[in-house]
């Protein structure tokens, strides 16, 4: 027994004195979820899961927002169309005369009637006879001027836009005629020569399409307007007797829906009238 213990002690002392150092071991990587020191790495798991959940939530949120925006735009468009059709189906007021019939599905006829109504009833052109000149206006813009010059030395008076003392002294038009953009006479005021006793009204502008040609006396219109135009534009050097000079009549009417009379006359037989 003593011999065995002595052998063991000798071997242990020899191992310590030899100074043998053990090689360092490579560290073992710790993976997510791998137990470490008897405990699971739950903190890393929660962090990675949170990033993934946030990404998925962001994608879902963007998708829901896009769908909600699309649905909102569609509802707004449907509401706008519904409101438009509802208003159009009512049509304008009866006295306005802008719509021929109620248009529920389509509005082409109603819109067309409004355009025609505006074209027929709006005063676009004006012929004004002042002193020795006749002017043609489009709205308030002068686009043509005819001067009845005797031997070329008559002064031309141009009215200014701004009101001044000079404007008050300018001669006023002796006669004026108003035309719509399709050439119909829609208004006239002033003194016009009267060569015949036949009373004739120029055709009134109509606010509807179908009844325009039926209600309009075309012959009367041509006879009245051509005479008015010829007398306003062309200055005739006709020697008249005192009795004939008195045959002037003052007329004024408004063509915009009013029914006031406007007396016209036929061109003279000498053929100088403008047709």
From Swiss-Prot:
Give UniProt keywords alphabetically. Answer: Glycoprotein, Signal, Sporulation
Q: Where is the composition biased (Basic and acidic residues)?
A: 234-249
- What does the UniProt record say this protein does? Involved in formation of a polar tube through which the infectious agent is passed on to the host cell.
Q: Where is this region: Disordered?
A: 233-275
* One GO biological process term: sporulation resulting in formation of a cellular spore
Q: Where is the signal peptide?
A: 1-18
Write the protein's name.
Polar tube protein 2
Q: Where in the cell is it found?
A: Spore polar tube
One cellular component (GO) term of this entry: polar tube
Which Pfam families does the annotation name? PTP2
List all Acidic residues biased stretches: 253-263
Ribonucleoprotein listed as a keyword: no
Q: Which domain of life is it from?
A: Eukaryota
Identify the glycosylated residues. 132, 248
